[in-house]
């Protein structure tokens, strides 16, 4: 693979699926604030004029689901019927039930350290030294473009922007190293009064140029800004949204494998979420320690069982020390049982709403992004 292209995409906080993710995680956070041991599996569906919140929740906490939903939509920016969705007037339906006692008996144990996994499943974590946050560049810059779209929309720089947007960036690689950006796609919802030429110029100057490094842009880079020419109808009016439908956007943009489990709305007893975070933490510390340039971790679990049923480490031939040393380091320095990883990453806190837009990884404010084990790993591996 001497020369190749690789593409990832992202979506904004106003994309219908991301509205759903943020509502689900807002509910989770509100419950964890009162009851850190709650069991939460919250799903959301949004469509024109309506939000349905459902799932299984077992908790001693009380949360005003309707007001929380409206506040979340309001923060995103859907506050007027002209946008096709209005936080103040949309219907909010609540269909939440309790978690099955059959699941509880496998998860809850007398000794917390023996807490079983909330379900079976496989989870992947990944890191590479392509960017300063040890994430693949295509997904990193796709996120940054739609983050910038939200910033200039909310601060009034481009007041005619609306909340729904998508980005996509294609990078050129040679011998596994970035040599440039081949293509950029950015589609953004807008009000009816802005012309397409004015929109394209403003998006280029205020969003794309400030975000993408100039050294990766050339005369051959292709830019596609609102390529259909018009994007007035968007958000839940354009498409329905569902929790958990942007799992590749949430993770590595397709640069690493995915176990299939979504994150948003799930408390940390659900290993779909917590073990994926732990796998990222392990992979990132291995790369930060200089043990490998790229690292992918796979974990698997059985419902009600504490220890992972398997741990896989893949370094794609980039390892700087023997594979056996890396595997032994993972076993020695990372507790990957459900209780252990919750404690290791301090997951029983209300930090999840922020994760629900612009990616769960590569953002230093989250505990699974810490590289606090890198020094231990270096010492263990004898890396100077």
UniProtKB/Swiss-Prot annotation:
Pfam families: S-AdoMet_synt_C, S-AdoMet_synt_M, S-AdoMet_synt_N. Keywords: ATP-binding, Cytoplasm, Magnesium, Metal-binding, Nucleotide-binding, One-carbon metabolism, Potassium, Transferase. Mg(2+) binds at residue 17. Its cofactor is Mg(2+); K(+). The keyword Cell membrane does not apply. It is found in: Cytoplasm. Residues 99-109 are annotated as: Flexible loop. This is S-adenosylmethionine synthase.
